[in-house]
Amino acid sequence: MKFNEAPSADGVWHHCHLLPAADPAQAIRDGAIVVEQGRIAWLGAFAALPDVYRHLPRHDANGAWITPGLVDCHTHLVYGGQRADEFAMRLAGASYEEIARAGGGIVSTVRATREADEATLFAQASARLEPLLAEGVTAIEIKSGYGLSLEAERKQLRVARQLGETYGVAVHTTFLGAHALPPEYAGRADAYIELVCETMLPALAAEGLVDAVDAFCEGIGFSIAQTTRVFEAAARHGLPVKLHAEQLSNLGGAALAARHKAISADHLEHLDEAGVVAMAEAGTVAVLLPGAYYFLRDTQLPPLALLRKHGVPMAISTDHNPGTSPTTSLLLMMNMGCTIFRMTVPEVLAGVTTHAARALGAADRHGLLAVDRAADFVLWQVASPAELAYWFGRNPCAAVVRRGRVFRKGEGWQR
């Protein structure tokens, strides 16, 4: 079903329970939502439904819980190919260096992405996006970073925009040119950062393809000084920044991100208290990525106690990518957030709604059920919202409303 052919959600949604935000204390049992012209006009207890809305068409939610649409705030969804062969090599004991020498690793994805045309990239990314939409995702971040040339990065970002237009999902694009060194710049990292800052970013920003700028600040990525150059270039174009930080080591990337008022710092397994304090003071969201932690069989947990102590908002995301987190299930990430990272159910609910929206700089658009917001919400056939994190391998989503259009399970609802 094409997005513009899906039925309208306008009318009164009733026979439901509402969770307007992640806090269970705000739940409304026997609630109702009124949608007019694709936006939420009213919500509350059904018994308090104003008379002015009682004549509108009714949508029976069949006892479902309704939450805000989910937000997947860190993905690398658009790329060529996949790396299952590399996964098998790793399981057989091959090191990262051995895989790279055999032509694997990120270079293989860069090669496949550069070789693919936009139609191919769109078809492959669509197959990854649709399972996320089927789990209630209504807003998603999509990074570039597998092109590593102006032409190929542009191609990734154009496809990301096309996905949003085709599926009616809110796509937030992030330019991640500073993801890795392309083969042609081996040993010349500073020269490549010059290209990123002075050629790629200005051109892509001028074309309206960039909503935010990211970098990979690690020993195997880019240094603090090089990342600083990327952030300064983003500032010249009025773009917010975010950062892959402290995943493999503590270089002080989170503190750097905070100094530049980054909207998020992501991964953070090796984050220390100084970095946590800096993030808290800057209002930077901690985006936790249990899929990559699991897939890499990591043992260093993010410092949850410190993040809680200093009041840093925590988001959860799939980090969908071919090398370290080839998952298309945000619900599974919620379960892993609880079982592996030891988060609470309210924390993971906030992590895929309100806090994930903050991590995109879009808290005014996503992550809450509120009057005057777009009608983006999900119907779940569960007895309690806790079931969203409890189950794994099961999708209890019955229907999704995206931009005021209804997509029901079993009716070609993903598209």
UniProtKB/Swiss-Prot annotation:
GO term, biological process aspect, one: L-histidine catabolic process to glutamate and formate
Q: Which reactions does this protein catalyse?
A: 4-imidazolone-5-propanoate + H2O = N-formimidoyl-L-glutamate
**InterPro entries (UniProt xref):** Amidohydro-rel, HutI, Metal-dep_hydrolase_composite, Metal_Hydrolase
- Transcription among the record's keywords? no
What pathway is this protein a component of? Answer: Amino-acid degradation; L-histidine degradation into L-glutamate; N-formimidoyl-L-glutamate from L-histidine: step 3/3
Q: Where does 4-imidazolone-5-propanoate bind?
A: 83, 146, 179, 247, 324
Reading the lineage from the top rank, the first entry is: Bacteria
The protein's GO terms of the molecular function aspect are: imidazolonepropionase activity; iron ion binding; zinc ion binding
| Entries under Pfam families matching the protein | Amidohydro_1
Q: In terms of one coarse class, where is the protein primarily found? A: cytoplasm
Q: Subcellular localization, per the record?
A: Cytoplasm
The residues listed in the UniProt record as binding Fe(3+), with positions renumbered to this chain, are 74, 76, 244, 319
Q: Where does N-formimidoyl-L-glutamate bind?
A: 146, 321, 323
What's any one GO cellular component for it? cytoplasm
Q: What class of enzyme is it?
A: hydrolase
Give the UniProt keywords, A-Z. Answer: Cytoplasm, Histidine metabolism, Hydrolase, Iron, Metal-binding, Zinc
Q: Which residues form the signal peptide?
A: none
| Enzyme Commission code(s) on record | 3.5.2.7
Primary role: Catalyzes the hydrolytic cleavage of the carbon-nitrogen bond in imidazolone-5-propanoate to yield N-formimidoyl-L-glutamate. It is the third step in the universal histidine degradation pathway.
* Membership in a protein family: Belongs to the metallo-dependent hydrolases superfamily. HutI family.
Q: What name does UniProt use for this protein?
A: Imidazolonepropionase
Organism, as annotated? Cupriavidus metallidurans (strain ATCC 43123 / DSM 2839 / NBRC 102507 / CH34) (Ralstonia metallidurans)
Its encoding gene is what?
hutI
